[in-house]
């Protein structure tokens, strides 16, 4: 079982969870995703890794409750657990394999909105950790739906 350390509503109908998943946290890179399953009856749901902390062994996911399984997920609290939490899956962002010095010469701009901001955050964080400047343009239908603004 994969224990939920934190669960909160970031904005109207957008939720964030920090999940204990040490193996996933050790191996993930920006652009990858996990597949979660809350319980035996739940569907397997692919979700972008919004953040990871290798030292703490945690993964952060952000989602909107659209289907039955994500609607159940939004009711999970800190201390609850996911039945399955598989990852990291998918290809990392292209720049993870590029030469750092070459990346420093480029102008990198991300455009994101609403829950689609979640995949941008780990990429910006990775670039910043490697001394690479990048910009982000974040929008949403209303100011209340802008997420991760402080983090970025």
Q: What residue spans do the PLM features occupy?
A:
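FNR/FR-type flavoprotein reductase catalytic core
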Residues: 71-152
